[in-house]
Amino acid sequence: MVSLIITSYNYAQYVERAIRSALDQSLSKSEYEILVINDCSTDRTVDVLSNYTEEVRVFNLEKNLGLSGARNYGIQKAKGQFIVFLDADDYIHRDLLKVQKLFLEENTSLDAVSTDYYLVNEKGVRQRHVNAEEEPIACGIMFRKDFLYNVGLYDETFRAREEEELRIRWTKKYNIHNVIIPLYRYRMHDSNLTKNEDAMSKHQDLLQSKHKE
């Protein structure tokens, strides 16, 4: 089984699109589950998610854990042996889970599989096809759950650059393959965490300190 984990913090205006793309997968419904981790949002996220409680496993956290903590929480609640992360402001092509699951099942030496992605604007209009090997992101990658536990999950001391920190650890001894089909949609908008320059700068120093070698 595949566990698709959507993490959301104050993305009520986007999370419904993410959920709809998850529900619309070509993979059989019996082969995957959807978990939404609401990281103590203060907007209308709870109200939006209340419409999907029969189709989606919703977890409304009482304390904000940050992206790393919310993803780790989702991993611990997941029933599947394969894990995929979807940020609440992004969405996915309907064949993402089917393609990645088939690839991992037929290539047992691989620990994870990614795909290329499209950058889209706030309205969802495609801007650019991105090669995920050249410009990697953590979302839209299907991991074996055992791999995530072996590599040590996300470091919850990181409130930014957590994906880079995890990537440094996994590239040292694990195998990941990229499929050159753009099956993930990465939305660019003004409130993206990656645009918080102060947080990114602070955690760049933390990243360098942890991985001096």
Language model regions located:
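Nucleotide-sugar donor-binding/catalytic module of glycosyltransferases
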Residues: M1-H203
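Membrane-interface aromatic/basic loop that binds lipid-linked glycans or pyrophosphate carriers
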Residues: S41, Q208-E213
